[in-house]
Amino acid sequence: MCPRETPGALGMLTKIPNMLTIGRIVAIPLLVVALIFLEAPLANWIAFTFYTLACVTDFFDGYLARALGQQSAFGRFLDPIADKLLVASVLLVLVGVDRISDVTVLPAAVILCREILVSGLREFLAEVRVPMPVTALAKWKTTIQMLALGFLLVGPAGPEFGPLSTTEVGVIGLWGAALLTLVTGADYLIVGIRQIAAVDERAADSEEKPGSSPDTGGGKMRKAG
C-alpha cells in the first residue's frame, strides 16, 4: 500500500505548478528575515526581490497548470493559501518595521479582514459545491495591492516619484486597494449570505417533509388540547 502512495505523493509535489506554489511559500520567511535582520537599504531590496519572485510564481503556477495539463486538487488547495500567507506576512512585517504605522494600519487591517472573510466564504461554498468566481474588480484589487506592497517593501531605499517618495506611493496604493477590498468584499459577502440562506431553506424543507404526513393528525390534536 505504501509503495503505491509514495509515487503519487512525489508526483503531486514535483509538478512544476505545485513546486512554484511551494516556492512562493518558502519565499515568505526569507523576505521577512531579510527585512527585519539585514541593514537598509540592502534589506529593502532583498525583501523586494523575494516578494517579486513570489508574485511572479503566483502568475506562472496557474498558467503552467493549465498549459501543461497539471491542474490538481493539491494546487487548488495550496494556491489561495500561499497568496493569503504572502499578503498577511508582508503586511505584518511592514507594520513591525514601522513602514506601515498610525492611520495607515487601517487599510492594512481592512485587507487582512477581507482575506479572512473570503477564505471562510470560499470554504463554506466549496462544501455546498457553489463556485465563487473571481470578479474583474477583485483582479484589479489584487494588482494594486501587489504593487503597493512592493513599493512599501522598497520604502526609503527607493527613488522619488515627483513630489512623492516610494513609501508614499505605496501608502496611496494601499488605500486604493483597501477601498476596492471593501467593495469586492461586500460583493462576496452578499453572495455568501444568499447561498447560506438557500442552504438553510433547503435544510428546513428536508426536515419538514419526512415528518409532515404521519404527524399531521397528532400535531392537530396536540394544538387542540
Where are these regions (language model features)?
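Active-site His/Glu-centered metal-binding helix of metallohydrolases
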Residues: 26, 56-64, 81, 85, ...
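C-terminal membrane-associated helical module and adjoining short loops/tails
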Residues: 1-17, 27-28, 47-55, 125, ...
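Membrane-embedded alpha-helical segments that form the functional core of polytopic membrane enzymes
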Residues: 27-74, 90-111, 165-182
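Core segments of transmembrane alpha-helices
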Residues: 24-31, 82-93, 118-119, 141-153
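Cytoplasmic-side transmembrane-helix entry/capping segments in multi-pass membrane proteins
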Residues: 78-82, 109-110, 135-141
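Membrane-water interface of transmembrane alpha-helices
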Residues: 114-124
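Transmembrane helix-loop junction
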Residues: 35, 66-67, 96-97, 123, ...
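Hydrophobic alpha-helical transmembrane segments of integral membrane proteins
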Residues: 13-14, 22-26, 76-79
